[in-house]
Regions:
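Conserved Radical SAM active-site core
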Residues: 1-118
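Auxiliary Fe-S-binding modules of radical SAM enzymes
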Residues: 14, 35, 113-114, 121-216
Length: 216
């Protein structure tokens, strides 16, 4: 954790107006484990060093069977939810995500949305909790799942339906973000007419989804 504390303090000193939106729940859990800390202690120290908000990375699909199939090394459903709840109790704003289109079934997508909604409902009054929800399509290029015969099957209409369902179910989360980086600008623009109210940010550099086949 010392590395991140020093990094965050240096960034805040050099760029006082910058807001640090960094480290998802898996990273927080990993830092806590290798530092001999609880995740709550880890979050407190990172916030003291300058962390402003936590991205929703690593949520994938919040279902134990799905996670065992696609990301067995990542924290469990319970761990992801626990880190986010701790962040909320400390007043740290977060976002939530859903990566769909691999081995999950429609009911597991719905269960994922309900888990996010229920966690937001537990956010202490006056704390920001989840500020946004961002669903995106699984990109298969170069992944282990592709080698097992599971490839990207992107449908713009399905994405629009997921955006609409997210807006209806997540009535306690203020913003639904269209992931233009993974679905393309045209689909993201259509999503703005279907429940999304956020297009996210312009990225200076991105290597994760581009390496998996996204070319937006």
């Amino acid at each position: 954790i010392d590395f991140y504390e020093e990094l965050f303090r240096d960034l805040k000193r050099m760029f006082p107006r910058i807001r640090l939106h960094a480290l998802g729940a898996p990273e927080v859990a990993h830092i806590a484990r290798i530092s001999g800390l609880t995740t709550l202690e880890t979050l407190r120290r990172l916030m003291a060093a300058g962390l402003d908000s936590l991205p929703g990375a690593g949520a994938e699909i919040l279902d134990p069977d799905v996670r065992r199939a696609i990301s067995p090394a990542k924290p469990s459903v319970a761990s992801w939810l626990a880190v986010m709840h701790e962040a909320h109790t400390l007043g740290l704003a977060t976002s939530a995500t859903m990566m769909y289109g691999h081995v999950e079934q429609p009911r597991q997508r719905v269960d994922h949305l309900l888990a996010i909604r229920d966690l937001q409902a537990r956010c202490p009054e006056g704390k920001p909790g989840f500020l946004a929800f961002i669903p995106w399509i699984f990109r298969s290029t170069g992944t282990r799942l592709e080698a097992e015969g599971i490839s990207t099957d992107f449908s713009p209409l399905e994405y629009i339906r997921i955006i609409a369902a997210s807006r209806l179910i997540l009535n306690n989360i203020p913003n639904i973000q269209a992931s233009w980086l993974t679905v393309g600008r045209q689909t993201a623009q259509a999503a703005l007419h279907s429940g999304a109210n956020d297009m996210g940010s312009i990225m200076i550099e991105e290597h994760v989804v581009s390496s998996a086949g996204a070319d937006n």
